[in-house]
């Protein structure tokens, strides 16, 4: 086999994998609308029972997801169902859409939460909390959603949250440990976005950037039930010896106080929430294998 042929094969394999997980392709293959029936994966939704559709979310791929969702719905449903919404995205993903507002939640080169992100997160909370039982919320979640949708609890400032995130990252904390702490400091993470929704139905379309697709970890589990607690967060901080010199004293006090109240009331997670992972590395690797063409190179696919 010549070097040119090997190069062409490698490009074809890589391209097939990338194309398969582009947001536009994933929405096209996952969302179908026929008359008043909307199908998301294998879930059918009777839109004749839906008054309004609100679309919210965050992530680096969520702008393209929103654009493709508008296309899937079509102009008639966009108008009839009063489709509206708000998506927090990086500044370089901004584009005009028909009904869904895209909000620049951070500069393209900054992968940290910003005050602009907090503003957008509060808008999203307002939208879902103003829905009613006859409404449908569609949440579009993709990689980077955690940093793009910051909404600190009242006792903690954004700068304090940034400080503990930087400290843990520099100390070698993994994504699970980071999110364990961040979820306890947020009004939207750890399933709280879903809890805040007053809609009769919430459906999330998720592009996973985490091995194994753990719903409570992807974008810090915006619409996934969270089994963690404040003691878990305190354990992470203790593991990395986080003291007042490393993170704020008020943050440590907040975590410790909440951990001591762990048996206090915890809101029940709603039963009308459905999460669909429409894209992940398995989709990409399967398409890449198919992209090898008639040669069908031996493949060793691992997502562990």
Which residue stretches match the model-derived regions?
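N-terminal loops that bind phosphate or other acidic moieties
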Residues: 1-304
